[in-house]
Design a protein with these regions (language model features):
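Active-site nucleophilic cysteine motif
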Residues: 118-136
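Short acidic alpha-helical/loop segments enriched in Asp/Glu that coordinate divalent cations
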Residues: 138-149
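...with weaker cross-activation on analogous glycine-rich loops/strands in unrelated enzymes
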Residues: 147-173
């Protein structure tokens, strides 16, 4: 069996939640490495457990990310495309009920400044600011790692301190 068979079985098992995994080269062969989805809303998004990512890296070379869209088409969302660019890895999306696959490779995609769907950590307020400065002013701003959920961010809102570290200064009126 090829790795897609295992990934599809994983997606069917966890339906209606999104599943996630990695394609890893182990002893010259592509293998599917299932990962835990640690997202707070696993029916809508996925976040690969960092310990699973580390374990996969220990086994071999990670060449792709796999996740499922159990209730929508396997076409990548705007947030999926942005995240794919950030990882610089090939992505595969499977729709488990239809057994349909879509493959996507990084190609320089950037979400539009107007009309992007808000997704925490991918297309959120900071990414909009960062992308605006890059596209309109040619200024590259740091991309900050976010907590895994917006609720966790509310407990520790670090963007106020991040603005200063990014180079912004408060001006006197």
């Amino acid at each position: 069996m090829n790795w897609k068979t295992y990934a599809l079985a994983h997606a069917k098992l966890d339906d209606p939640n999104e599943t996630c995994g990695l394609v890893v080269i182990i002893k010259g062969k592509e293998k599917y490495f299932s990962c835990k989805n640690i997202a707070d809303q696993p029916k809508d998004i996925f976040i690969i457990d960092p310990s699973d990512w580390a374990a996969a890296e220990d086994c071999g070379e990670i060449t792709a990310i796999v996740h499922s869209h159990p209730t929508t088409s396997p076409q990548l969302s705007m947030a999926d495309k942005v995240a794919c660019e950030k990882t610089k890895l090939k992505w595969y999306v499977v729709q488990p009920n239809l057994e349909q696959w879509v493959e996507y490779e990084p190609c320089g995609y950037r979400a539009p400044l107007i009309g992007r769907k808000w997704v925490w950590g991918v297309n959120d307020c900071w990414s909009l600011c960062r992308d605006y400065y890059q596209e309109e002013l040619g200024i590259t701003l740091r991309d900050w790692d976010r907590p895994t959920s917006s609720d966790a961010f509310l407990l520790n809102p670090f963007f106020d301190s991040s603005f200063h570290a990014t180079g912004f200064r408060e001006l006197e009126p």
